[in-house]
A protein has these predicted regions:
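Hydrophobic repeat-domain scaffold segments
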Residues: 50, 117-220
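Extended hydrophobic
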Residues: 1-104, 109-111, 119-127, 131-147
Length: 220
């Protein structure tokens, strides 16, 4: 098999390989799939689960939560699915999820972030922008702390990510800056401190600064 060019291709290839793989037996016996879904159909369900759990900040979730998610997915897409079948296929056949007692989670946090990116790509621009902006504003560290999600998002839908996340962030900063009064207010609002140091080699002064956290977010 060819080596993927980026992590997004790796996760995509890993999913299709695991979902369609055969047991390591000479007879080539294929793993049982209880939900009887095509790879694309099952990928879409995982994307919806990833979308819902990621943006709700849930790494672990119980069967009731998953049942609610699958019920909503079925209503939206005119599907009839059993949660038990999805859990079995996700944990035993595709190995995309782990079950520990009554708790479920993606087999790796990066898989959850990848499927969340796939899921949000399936939304229209208005809803996608609403979710992404709310997520970025809820915690200023969200963007820098979820590199897999951001990398997948830019790989899957670069232009839409600029449109629905980057530009709104810039517009928000511009609006806040315009609402500020004189230069004194702008300095006190944006800068934590200024740092003056001397470059002994060139015998000159250098001026640096630290941005306040709420402003640094827009440049991180």
């Amino acid at each position: 098999a060819s080596i993927p060019n980026n992590l997004t291709d790796f996760y995509n290839q890993a999913f299709y390989t695991l979902y369609q793989r055969h047991d390591a037996s000479k007879s080539g016996y294929k793993r049982e799939l209880k939900a009887k879904l095509t790879p694309e159909e099952f990928r879409n369900i995982l994307a919806y689960i990833g979308l819902k759990t990621f943006f709700e900040g849930k790494v672990d979730f119980d069967r009731t939560t998953l049942d609610d998610i699958i019920t909503k997915y079925c209503l939206k897409n005119n599907f009839e699915l059993k949660t038990n079948d999805i859990v079995y296929d996700a944990t035993h056949s595709a190995c995309m999820m782990l079950q520990e007692g009554v708790s479920l989670k993606f087999s790796h946090r990066s898989f959850q972030e990848y499927f969340a990116a796939v899921g949000i790509n399936q939304l229209d621009d208005k809803l996608q922008r609403q979710i992404l902006v709310k997520w970025s504003e809820a915690d200023r560290n969200n963007i820098s702390s979820h590199r897999t999600f951001m990398n997948a998002l830019f790989t899957i839908q670069k232009e839409r990510t600029f449109k629905n996340l980057c530009i709104p962030i810039i517009e928000s900063m511009d609006e806040k800056y315009r609402r500020m009064g004189d230069i004194t207010e702008r300095i006190s609002t944006c800068f934590k401190c200024f740092i003056c140091s001397k470059d002994s080699r060139e015998n000159k002064l250098e001026l640096g600064f630290l941005l306040k956290n709420e402003v640094y977010f827009y440049y991180s």
